[in-house]
């Protein structure tokens, strides 16, 4: 690979962005970053606590700053937070600074993959499946808008999805 290019993974929670991103980075010998983990590292607090203290708007402002910093690097794979694309500036940066891959998954798979995860503040309520449906209705068009490639993650291993991405991108 002559030129180091960035690959940015977008998609809903439970799509496998972090797991697939690590495999992708390993295969391509790129650095891997997860925007949520980077926010936690910089603040010393977990995402749920930031949501509780600052609300979603405060969290999104932090997320935008972190994504701006990370997308300025070269030769990385970045797993973004599921809601990062709601911010127009984030969508613009992702599009301008790398290849954007939308990892698509069904609501059923999201429920199965996230049901025991207490670190997802938006799902800590009576009906997480309905929350996921509502989020999908709002966010899926934004994922599609920003995506250079769309890859379904439902019935494949993370490594198989990573290899499919490499093949689609032509790396």
Swiss-Prot record:
Any one of the GO CC terms: cytosol
GO molecular function term, any single one: ATP binding
Major localisation: cytoplasm
KW Mitochondrion (keyword) present: no
Subcellular location(s) per record: Cytoplasm
Cofactor note text: Binds 1 Mg(2+) ion per subunit.
InterPro entries xref list: P-loop_NTPase, Shikimate/glucono_kinase, Shikimate_kinase/TSH1, Shikimate_kinase_CS
EC number(s) reported in the record: 2.7.1.71
GO biological process: amino acid biosynthetic process; aromatic amino acid family biosynthetic process; chorismate biosynthetic process
Record text on subunit structure and interactions: Monomer.
Annotated protein name in UniProt: Shikimate kinase
Source organism of the structure: Alteromonas mediterranea (strain DSM 17117 / CIP 110805 / LMG 28347 / Deep ecotype)
Taxonomic placement: Bacteria, Pseudomonadati, Pseudomonadota, Gammaproteobacteria, Alteromonadales
